[in-house]
Every structure is written in C-alpha cells, then in structure tokens.
Swiss-Prot record:
Keywords: ATP-binding, Cell inner membrane, Cell membrane, Membrane, Nucleotide-binding, Translocase, Transport. Its EC number is 7.6.2.7. Pfam families: ABC_tran. It comes from the Bacteria. SUPFAM superfamilies: P-loop containing nucleoside triphosphate hydrolases. The lineage of its organism: Bacteria, Pseudomonadati, Pseudomonadota, Alphaproteobacteria, Rhodobacterales. It is an enzyme of class 7 (translocase). ATP binds at residues 41-48. One of its GO terms (cellular component) is plasma membrane. This is Taurine import ATP-binding protein TauB.
Length: 268
C-alpha cells in the first residue's frame, strides 16, 4: 500500500438561485499507509464534504484523489465508512451485521466465520453476537459498526464523528478501542471530530480546517496517539504538551467562529 494522495481538491456547490458555495478550495494532503489523521474545524469548513469525496460519494469540482496508485472515481471496498449513527441493520443480529460485507463478497463460510469471530472478540461483543442491534446501547452499536467496517478489510477507514453521540465514559472507552484497532490492523484512518481533545488523543497528525472556502489552515504532528496505545488516556492528557496544544487549537477555532459570526452580522 502506497497511501492516499489528495491533490488540489476543490468542491463547488451550485444553488437553485444561481449562486454557489465554494465548500473546498485547493486542498492537498498526503497520507502514508497506516497513518491516523484527525480533522478539526468550525462548522461549515468542509470536513464532511472532504470525507465524502474521499469515500467516493461526491465527485470533486476539480482535483484528484489517488489511493494505492489508482484514481478514486466512486465508492469501493478499499474505503470503509463509520458514521456518527451506526447505520446498522437493526433487525439483524450483531453477527449478521458484521458478516454482511463478507457475505456479499462471497467469502467462503469458514473464512467468514473466522473473521467475524475474531472481530467480535476484538471489540468485546462475543457474548452479544446473537442479540439484535436494537437491543444494544449506543456504545455497543458503534463497536458493531467498527467491526462491520473492518470485516470488509478496507485499506482506509473514514470516521465521521463516530463517537459524538456517546456519553463521556463510553466515549473514552471507544477512543481507546479505536487506538487499539489502529495499531493491530495497520489501517489508514481519517477521523472527523468536533472535539479538540479527541483529535489530539487519536491523531498522529491533525489538520485544522478554515471555512469560506474550506481549506487546510494548520497541520500538527502529535505524539499522543502512540502514547495512548499502551497507556490510560487520562494519563496521556497529563503530558506537558497536551494542555498548551489544546488551548492553542481551541483559541484558533474560536477565532474562526467569531469571524464567521461577525460576517453574518455585517451581512445582516
């Protein structure tokens, strides 16, 4: 695997009244295989638009995306998506949900069962495998969503606010699980989040996007994800660089939000 290259990506949405919105402008980014990237920014900066283009759900106005030497032109099995809401088949059991992708690909039953059992062990759901999804808590449903994504063995996992709806304790446990799965599988992960703390804990790299038009404003290389694989995340937060970096990024995003609100008031 050679990784993902995003080259001069722009996205323009045409509005019914003839106006347009420039959601992204000349975004370029290279991710090596196995990298974990966190993406932050104020609402409307194009984070989810960028993720949807990488997923192949949207075609960019200009620019290109190259994954493992091939141009991305639409959705395919090389990229898996985990949403804020699990997007699971609620009438199916946990096992059936995780097995869905391999079943659609015609994976032999012996191989499929081995994969599903392994992933259920990894995410701690082996004892719940016959439960219907609707019987599970939100945190458990997100564990199913992660396992289902991994069952398809994508090269890149795209995560759009996957932990945003969880309570604080469950969210911390899921953050630890994401780091564990990242290290065990070697997958490339792009994580969209509104939480500065979460972005710092989970990202080897972190980009802050600015709005109007959406673009990369600043990039950081971080030590915290590697530390969090083997340590309690609460201990990682005590790292001397963590607090100052958190404050720096929070202030940066607050300044952007104030500029947006100021622009709205001027327009009014």
């Amino acid at each position: 695997m050679t990784g993902l290259s995003i080259n001069n990506l722009s996205m323009r949405f045409e509005l019914p009244n003839g106006d347009h919105v420039q959601a992204l402008q000349d975004v370029s980014l290279d991710l090596k295989a196995g990298e974990l990237l966190s993406v932050l920014g104020p609402s409307g900066c194009g984070k989810t638009t960028l993720l949807n283009i990488v997923a192949g759900f949207l075609a960019p106005t200009s620019g290109e995306l190259i994954l493992n030497g091939h141009r991305i032109t639409g959705p395919d099995a090389e990229r898996g998506m985990v949403f804020q809401q699990g997007a699971l088949f609620e009438w199916m059991s946990v096992r059936e949900n995780v097995a869905f992708g391999p079943s659609m690909k015609g994976t032999p039953k012996v191989d499929k069962d081995k994969t599903v059992d392994h992933l259920l062990d990894v995410v701690g759901l082996q004892d719940f495998k016959e439960k219907a999804v609707y019987e599970l808590s939100g945190g458990m449903q997100q564990r199913v969503a992660l396992a289902r994504c991994l069952a398809n063995d994508p090269d890149v996992i795209l995560m759009d606010e996957p932990l945003g709806a969880l309570d604080a304790l469950t969210r911390e446990k899921m953050q630890s699980l994401v780091l564990k799965l990242w290290k065990e599988t070697g997958k490339t992960i792009i994580l969209i989040t509104h939480s500065v703390e979460e972005a710092l804990l989970l990202g080897e790299r972190l980009i802050v996007m600015a709005p109007r038009p959406g673009r990369i404003h600043k990039e950081y290389r971080l030590p915290f994800a590697d530390l969090g694989v083997d340590s309690d995340l609460r201990e990682v937060k005590k790292h001397p660089e963590f607090g100052p970096r958190r404050e720096e990024i929070l202030n940066m995003i607050w300044d952007m939000e104030e500029e947006i609100m100021g622009g709205k008031e001027d327009a009014a």
